[in-house]
């Protein structure tokens, strides 16, 4: 079976936004206008197609990235059918990992902003992630029908707060109750969508007289932005010649794909206005897979030779697994993006990250949580596979005879932990299975057993993240559990360098004995740097090379549970430079135990300290409550970094220890009568104050 849509007519896009910007509603309208949904699903009645988890429908927020495929031929049927693969991503900061991993496999993004709230805290986080992966993007200013909507104010915020170069393609005609359509700044025509058929059809009209001057000004801005990096067009423009519509669009597209400009459209998804023109902009100004740079990777060889794959069906197969999801009927679904080549159901491929073979049982195209089985997928496709046994997020799947490892995704370390205990014996068996499955799905969620208390500890990116995990355990796996109080993920490190630390493990009392002897040096590393560095400085074979890895392993085991208070040890270097061995009695175990003993001894001499996680907190509050909010942040050991003035509210930026932020959402609501909002993300680890450290260490010793 050959490809039905040429790769030049593919668009792999993500839809991203701050919570409550109307992103899921925008996606629902896209699905309606492209013909997949015959009835529009609304978020506020829990019927949205892309929000298919029960928790999402209850809370009205998007938690996981649902993927769907649809087709669009243009508002006026002016294009050949284009295939749009859409990833809908969450807007809550606890689910940033979902945004991160979808950005990794996308070619373009649509950023949705609220015409009232504008650029909000999470918008900046998502923008940084798009910058990191160099994703071209267009913006959609939504909710133009809401009280306080102001399109040009949001355009200005995109410029100032995100450091972008925004170029509006449209102007809003009216705002709030009087929002009726948009001015197309390329055609210089007013566009009105008909209410009688939910905006499926539209008409071009003359620009309202009161908007002619403003439209001319922004049309000139658009044309100047288009010709700026095209000498031929610039000369034509300066000579006073009229530029054609296709010349303007082609020049804008080139600059948008190079991330030099961000094109902006507007509308009201809820009122069925503007999403249709947004779809046209996706086709005209976002890249096809063959517009973007070739994907980089390394060959699966000793030298790790750099290699590339281009978006071509004839190239060797390569794909990236970007999400694992559990399905109640078929088990694990592995979402993957094909970068090159073709794969059919039944094919055996190579998982180069784990150096093992995998067989594609079945391949399905996803539409939210509905599946359509397909026989094969091509370069540029996003699909899900059933039957892959040992694939995890970030693994590369490739041709058996032409292996490559594509650049892996980076996942943040969890910052908050809670203990979970099953209520019954039956729950205990099911809980292990449930947590294993959930950890496989979500790389920012971790599970471990506390060595001292034997409790199961789960860790994640925030309180809401762990709440959802516990909720899913109950709903999807019928596991009832008692949940402990949130715990902070502290770390341990050292401040001083110490030398001549001796570790011995010697037992020689007849028969085969044990002999391991090491001398090491401990030294601090740059904070947030390499984490752990092992230097083998053994000269003259005083310790045989076969025991070196056992010494390294013995130290690494101690890093998991630090000598100070049992927290992981970070930013520490170990230099092994002397020791001795016995021809008969030395063993890997003896050297491992000797290294562990030396590390424990040296750590206590090297001025050990406790590190606490510091969060970057951004609070948006009405002016009236600013004093209360700042006072409360100060009481929480927060440091106010700065403030920004919005028209009706203030933004407060602060750095606050995570341990002081538990329950903050409730406190902020009561302080501001529910009118303030905040976002919080991990910033860095710093030394915890003496009194805090003392309390924690004493509690751990009891």
Curated annotation (Swiss-Prot):
Give the source lineage, highest ranks first. Bacteria, Pseudomonadati, Pseudomonadota, Gammaproteobacteria, Enterobacterales
Protein role: Catalyzes the GTP-dependent ribosomal translocation step during translation elongation. During this step, the ribosome changes from the pre-translocational (PRE) to the post-translocational (POST) state as the newly formed A-site-bound peptidyl-tRNA and P-site-bound deacylated tRNA move to the P and E sites, respectively. Catalyzes the coordinated movement of the two tRNA molecules, the mRNA and conformational changes in the ribosome.
Q: List the disulfide bonds.
A: none
Keywords, A to Z, come to: Cytoplasm, Elongation factor, GTP-binding, Nucleotide-binding, Protein biosynthesis
Q: Name one GO molecular function term.
A: GTP binding
Cellular component (GO) terms are: cytoplasm
Provide the residue positions that the database annotates as binding GTP. 17-24, 88-92, 142-145
Q: Which GO terms describe its biological process?
A: ribosome disassembly
The entry's localization annotation reads: Cytoplasm
Check the record and name the SMART domains matching this protein: EFG_C, EFG_IV
The entry's protein name is Elongation factor G
- Which family, according to UniProt? Belongs to the TRAFAC class translation factor GTPase superfamily. Classic translation factor GTPase family. EF-G/EF-2 subfamily.
The encoding gene is fusA
Q: Which HAMAP family match?
A: EF_G_EF_2_B
Chain ranges of the tr-type G domain: 8-290
Q: Which domain of life is it from?
A: Bacteria
């Amino acid at each position: 079976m050959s490809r039905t849509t040429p790769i030049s007519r593919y668009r792999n896009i993500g839809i991203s936004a701050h919570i409550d910007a109307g992103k899921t509603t925008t996606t629902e309208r896209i699905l309606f206008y492209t013909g997949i949904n015959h009835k529009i699903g609304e978020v506020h009645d829990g019927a949205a197609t892309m929000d298919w988890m029960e928790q999402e429908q209850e809370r009205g927020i998007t938690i996981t990235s649902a993927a769907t495929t649809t087709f669009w031929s243009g508002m006026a049927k002016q294009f050949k059918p284009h295939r749009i693969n859409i990833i809908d991503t969450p807007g809550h900061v606890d689910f940033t990992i979902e945004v991160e991993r979808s950005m990794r496999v996308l070619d373009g993004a649509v950023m949705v902003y609220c015409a009232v709230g504008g650029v909000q805290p999470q918008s900046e986080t998502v923008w940084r992630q798009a910058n990191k992966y160099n994703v071209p993007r267009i913006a959609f200013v939504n909710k133009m029908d809401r009280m306080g909507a102001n399109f040009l104010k949001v355009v200005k915020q995109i410029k100032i707060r995100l450091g972008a170069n925004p170029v509006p393609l449209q102007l809003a005609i009216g705002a709030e109750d009087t929002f009726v359509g948009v001015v197309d700044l390329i055609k210089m025509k007013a566009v009105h969508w008909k209410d009688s058929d939910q905006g499926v059809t539209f008409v071009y009209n003359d620009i309202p007289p009161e908007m002619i001057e403003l439209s001319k000004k922004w049309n000139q801005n658009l044309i100047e932005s288009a010709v700026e990096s095209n000498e031929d067009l610039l000369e034509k423009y300066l000579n006073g010649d009229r530029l054609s519509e296709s010349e303007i669009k082609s020049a804008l597209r080139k600059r948008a794909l190079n991330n030099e400009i961000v094109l902006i459209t507007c509308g009201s998804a809820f009122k069925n206005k503007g999403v249709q023109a947004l779809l046209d902009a996706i086709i005209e100004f976002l890249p096809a897979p063959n517009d973007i740079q070739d994907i980089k990777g390394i060959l699966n060889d000793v030298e790790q030779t750099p290699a590339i794959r281009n978006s071509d069906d004839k190239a060797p197969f390569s794909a990236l697994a970007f999400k694992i999801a559990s399905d109640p009927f078929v088990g694990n679904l592995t979402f993957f993006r094909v970068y090159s080549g073709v794969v059919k159901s039944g094919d055996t491929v190579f998982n180069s990250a784990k150096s093992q073979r995998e067989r594609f049982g079945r391949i399905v195209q996803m539409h939210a949580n509905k599946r359509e089985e397909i026989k094969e997928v091509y370069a540029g496709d996003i699909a899900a596979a059933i039957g892959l046994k040992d694939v995890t997020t970030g693994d590369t799947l490739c041709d058996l005879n032409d292996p490559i490892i594509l650049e892996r995704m980076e996942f943040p370390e969890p910052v908050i932990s809670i203990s979970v205990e099953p209520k019954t014996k039956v729950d205990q068996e099911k809980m292990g299975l449930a947590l294993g499955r959930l950890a496989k799905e979500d790389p920012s969620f971790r599970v471990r057993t506390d060595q001292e208390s034997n409790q199961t500890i789960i860790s994640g990116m925030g309180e809401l993240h762990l709440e959802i995990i516990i909720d899913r355990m109950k709903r999807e796996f019928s596991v009832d559990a008692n949940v402990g109080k949130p715990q902070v993920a502290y770390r341990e490190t050292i401040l001083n360098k110490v030398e001549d630390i001796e570790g011995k493990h010697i037992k020689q009392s007849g028969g085969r004995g044990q002999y391991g002897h090491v001398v090491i040096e401990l030294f601090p590393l740059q904070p947030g740097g390499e984490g752990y560095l092992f230097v083998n400085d053994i000269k003259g074979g005083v310790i045989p090379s076969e025991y070196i890895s056992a010494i390294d392993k013995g130290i690494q085991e101690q890093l998991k549970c630090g000598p100070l208070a049992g927290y992981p040890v970070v930013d520490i270097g170990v230099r092994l430079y002397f020791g001795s061995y016995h021809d008969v009695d030395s063993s890997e175990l003896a050297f491992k135990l000797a290294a562990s003993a030396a590390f424990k001894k040296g750590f206590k001499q090297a001025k050990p300290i406790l590190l606490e996680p510091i969060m970057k907190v951004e609070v948006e509050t009405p002016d009236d409550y600013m004093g209360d909010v700042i006072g409360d942040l100060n009481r929480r050991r927060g440091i106010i970094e700065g403030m920004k003035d919005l028209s009706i509210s203030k933004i407060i930026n602060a750095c606050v220890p995570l341990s002081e932020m538990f329950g903050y959402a409730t406190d902020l609501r009561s302080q501001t009568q529910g009118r303030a909002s905040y976002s919080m993300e991990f910033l860095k680890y710093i030394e915890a104050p003496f009194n805090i450290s003392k309390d924690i260490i004493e509690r751990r010793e009891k």
